[in-house]
Amino acid sequence: MKDHITPNLLKLARLFKKKGELYIVGGYVRNSLLGIYETDIDLASKLTNDEIKELLFGTKYEVKENSKKLGTLTISLGEEKWQHSTFRKETYAEGGAHFPIFVEFVNTVEEDAKRRDFTANCVYYNILKDEYVDPFNGMQDIQKHLLRAIQAPDSVLQSDGQRILRMVRLASELGFRIAGETILSAYDNRENLADITGARKNEELVAILNSSRRYKISKSNAYMFGLQMFNLLRLWPYFNAPVLKVRFALTSKVDEQYRMYALIADIISTSKYKFSVSETVKDLLGPKGLAYPESKIESFKHVLCGYFDALSKMDNKTFFMEYFDDYKIISALLAKKSKKLHKKYDFYYNYLKNNKIAIRIKDLKINGNDLKEHFPKLKDKFYKELAG
């Protein structure tokens, strides 16, 4: 670790020493013990935001407060940035809303550590002393590639629903096993996901779908481990999906850029069309699901409707009049589902492209002015349509 401490960070630690020790904590420490040095550095100490502002006033270090209540701020110098958190205790309301209702600042690593989630994330590195502080034997669990709650799992997972999703994501990205009692607690506390915002669910699910390339040690099938954990823990209903488990017939085969489309298609197929394609997409991506913007929901609906219309063997002309612009994505899904149908639609698509056959108004070699010249008495809307 010592060899990866920059001169600017070392100097910052020396400034802190006037009032307290400065530690690196969390993902950077965990990953460094795995030989990975490609994550942001999180810092922690007993100093409050106001004390840090006073300490660094007049130096080259810049300070930007993130949350006074939580005691978090960003310290930067040039291109280097560090997130700092004051040692604290947290109290949560019932449910899993991911935000403490009460915060108390404390003075020791041991007290701060009790608010954290998993032992692997709970190793502190003292920058100046070049030594680790490990209150919950996290270094041993990191060596074992084991993800385990720091205390009784229920006390860790029942107060913050996002920790369940983070658990699945980290295990996927790092190739860690999850301790049995931690898995059981996640299952028992899964209802807390109902209190997590759609945006946070979206962030975690997308990270899981992309987990195969997160780190150099991430496995090529890492994302499938995460999705299978969703099945095991029965998490899908909390993403507004009409199923408890999903058959990943398509998701397991497509390239990363198409995985979200494939996942939704697999959810629809698993549900045996309990609701229409449009309804299911809207439910999954709407406010109670992944909270996508309306424009993106419409885009997903169009692609998924096109995919299922292709499976229903819609005639070529009708299909491409409706789905020509989205065919690249539909084709990627169809290729992994039915080689015969993919070949059929691809042949027609390439025929249209190679022969430059007009499908959309913008493909026509005339514009609104041409139309007006030959048909001057039409209503304005016809000219405007071609002008676009």
PLM regions and their residue ranges:
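Catalytic cores of the polymerase beta-like nucleotidyltransferase superfamily
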Residues: 1-388
